[in-house]
Structures are given as structure tokens and as C-alpha cells.
Regions:
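Catalytic core of non-heme Fe(II) oxygenases with the double-stranded beta-helix
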Residues: 74-218
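Non-heme Fe(II)/2-oxoglutarate
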Residues: 1-95
Length: 218
């Protein structure tokens, strides 16, 4: 599995400012997701099977805030986060185009199990996670890969992703100011915080590049 990990992406002062923004009573809006905070569970049928239905122990209700996406969504709070996007670009070896940028807030639900394995999109893309604070709730990566050249159509790929068995490959611990970039076809899953940690906030990014960012030299 190829990935890029960057420590101390932002200055400590700016990181603290962003974290205070999303955790305080200062008007920053969070939007409740009653199904699962990992991805949308609407639609996606394969025969009589709802492709994105998931076991109860893999569901994780939570909150989200979309800062930017392909559908034209641009949050009025985006300007506060543009320095993060600039820093991500500066940390990578080639130009990128951001497709979606969203914040996810997960709560301690008492469960130790990871959430549903998934990819953010069936299309070619890169994905990244930026952690705003130290907490429990590892991001789990699996050996399984959604190969776009497998010969399966999109519905078949989704069905395979929902029904196949998964073997754990790597865990990434949420640590303040850490960026973790990976192939968007790699199956992964979030975990809710546990123990003394009551919440977990991470920035999720999806982007394109004309170059192979793992082959290019930084």
C-alpha cells in the first residue's frame, strides 16, 4: 500500500485556531447524519440488495460539514480552511485538483469496532485525512482494493465491496497536525473515539492529479 504521511502540516497557532473553531460555541455549523458519517447510504441497489446497508456494529452516526465539493457546494467557512488546502498542495510533489473537502465529527459510542469499510468514490482519485487533534479512533486500512480494471461494472464493484471479507493491513492513529494521503481505491474505515476521548474531528479530502503522486519526487 502506497501512502504519504506528513507531520506538522500547519503552524501550531493556525491548527489551534481551526480546532477551536470547530469545537466551540462560535456559530460553526455541524449537520447531523442519522445513517452513517462515513458515506451516504442512499440508493445503490444490486438486485434486491441495498449495497450500502451495513451491520449495526459498523454504523456510526455523526456530524459533517462539507466545505467544498464537485456539485458546487462552497461553504462560507471555506476561506478559513484554504490555508490547509494550500499546505496540502505544498506537501505534495505535483499539482492537485480538490474534488471534495469535508469535516467529520464522530462521537464516542462505546464501540471498539471499526466502521464500514468503503471507498469514497468508484472513480480514480486520491484521498487524504488531516487530523486536528490527538484522540483514539484509528483509521483502518485493508488489504482489499477496488480495482477499476477488474472488468466489473460499478454496481458489481459496490456489491463486492459490501459482501467481501476484509483483512486489516494498517492502522493510522489520529494525531494532531498529521496528514495521511492514500490511493482512493484502497478500502478503509474510520473508528469512533473510545475511552476518555468524547469526540473525533478529521478533515477528509478527495482530489485528482495528472501525475502519480507516489512516483513523483517531493
Amino acid at each position: 500500500m502506497k501512502y504519504i504521511q506528513v507531520e506538522n502540516l500547519l503552524t501550531p497557532t493556525y491548527l489551534s485556531r481551526l480546532f477551536d473553531q470547530v469545537k466551540g460555541m462560535n456559530g460553526f455549523p455541524w449537520y447531523f447524519l442519522s445513517d452513517d458519517v462515513s458515506y451516504s447510504t442512499n440508493g445503490f441497489m444490486f438486485g434486491d440488495t441495498k449495497l450500502l446497508d451495513m451491520p449495526e456494529d459498523e454504523k456510526a452516526i455523526g456530524f459533517t460539514h462539507v466545505l467544498l465539493d464537485q456539485e458546487g457546494v462552497e461553504s462560507p467557512w471555506l476561506s478559513h480552511w484554504l490555508p490547509v488546502l494550500d499546505s496540502v498542495q505544498d506537501a505534495l510533489p505535483c499539482p492537485v485538483q480538490f474534488l471534495r473537502v469535508r469535516l467529520a465529527l464522530q462521537l464516542n459510542n462505546g464501540k471498539m469496532h471499526h466502521n464500514a469499510p468503503h471507498t469514497d468514490s468508484e472513480k480514480d482519485h486520491y484521498a487524504a485525512l488531516f487530523y486536528l487533534h490527538d484522540c483514539t479512533g484509528d483509521t483502518v486500512f485493508f488489504d482489499q482494493y477496488d480495482d477499476p480494471n477488474s472488468g466489473l461494472n460499478i454496481d458489481e464493484r459496490w456489491y463486492k465491496g459490501r459482501t467481501q471479507s476484509y483483512t486489516e493491513r494498517l492502522r493510522v492513529k489520529p494525531e494532531a497536525n498529521k496528514l495521511f494521503v492514500f490511493d482512493g481505491h484502497q478500502y478503509h474505515a474510520s473508528s469512533n473515539p473510545n475511552g476518555e476521548h468524547k469526540f473525533r474531528v478529521a478533515l477528509n479530502l478527495n482530489f485528482l492529479s495528472d501525475d502519480d503522486i507516489f512516483a513523483a519526487k517531493v
